[in-house]
Amino acid sequence: MLCVAMAARPVSSTTSTCRPCLPAQVSASKPSTSSSPGTGVLVGVPRERGSSVSKAAIRGARLEAAARCSLVRQRPMLLATVAVGSLVAAGAANATEIGDSLLGSSGLALADLSVGDWFGNLLYSAGQQANEAVQDQLSALSFTSLAVIFGAGLVTSLSPCTLSVLPLTLGYIGAFGSGKDRSEVVGNSVAFSLGLATTLAILGVAASFAGKAYGQVGQGLPVAASGLAVIMGLNLLEVIELQLPSFFSDYDPRAAAANLPSSVQAYLAGLTFALAASPCSTPVLATLLGYVATSRDPIVGGSLLLTYTTGYVAPLLIAASFAGALQSLLSFRRYSAWINPISGAFLLGGGVYTLLDRLFPATSMVM
């Protein structure tokens, strides 16, 4: 019997190298029956089996060492994966909380926004976009520019400021056309619209001769127009009372115009109504006036102003073509007590908003 002594030293997990510690080589000397403590154990096996056992032990030690080295190498990658996963999870949680808060705040804002505010913001945005479109078209005039300016006139005629005087305009056209055929009503409406266009053209000529366009007069003209709108709104709301001088109180324009033809009366009425509605068309109109003042071309300037005023008065012409519908609107005269307060509220709100926007522009608040 041959005694083969094997001693296996365990592999340390803290070593920086991954070399397996192999068992002691099989001793080829004579068999020994003693064993020293800590060096191994006596295995009484035949010589043939001793060789096979040592090979199996070596193979097992190598596999164990390779497994431990693989674990050591993969530990940093595992830790990095866990760290990245934690960061992604935390970011997703924060994004969810932020999204919920934004949805909650937007839902609250939409809930607080009334239909009137939404409609007013829509009309205001449409007016600003129309003004920007006109400015873009003035850089290179074409037939498309005329269509854009005509559309800008339509948008301006639907502004809240213009709508505040729309009941008066419709009431005048309806009352003026009572008892007359449609052709005469349409003719008077055209004369009324020409009166509006004349006032706007006079403003353009005055601005051209003075050499002061909307963008060159600073804050004076918009602030003055806004202040006038606020005063007129307070007057319609009966907060303040405006009295004309005695000369105007003794003068009755209706009696003076009674002997004039109906078309002339409509034309004069258009001149008066345009004075009330001209501050409402300030953005687009002033852009056109500025271009006319700088281009010094009366033909081009007159064509642009005519196109704009045509779009501005187009809703009135369309309304005038439905004389029967206008007459049916007169049946609601019992509700006319609400016209002045509503018109005053429109004028007051538009005047205050424009005044604050001119005095404290939003661009100056941007850091």
From Swiss-Prot:
How does the protein's chain sit in the membrane according to the entry?
Answer: Multi-pass membrane protein
Q: What's a Pfam family this protein contains?
A: DsbD_TM
What InterPro entries does the record point to?
Cyt_c_assmbl_TM_dom, Cytochrome_c-biogenesis_DsbD
Q: Name one GO biological process term.
A: cytochrome complex assembly
Q: Does the keyword Transcription regulation apply?
A: no
Which of UniProt's keywords are assigned here? Chloroplast, Cytochrome c-type biogenesis, Electron transport, Membrane, Plastid, Thylakoid, Transit peptide, Transmembrane, Transmembrane helix, Transport
| Family membership | Belongs to the DsbD family.
Name of the protein in its database record? Cytochrome c-type biogenesis ccda-like chloroplastic protein 1
Query: Which gene is the coding source of this polypeptide chain?
Result: CCDA1
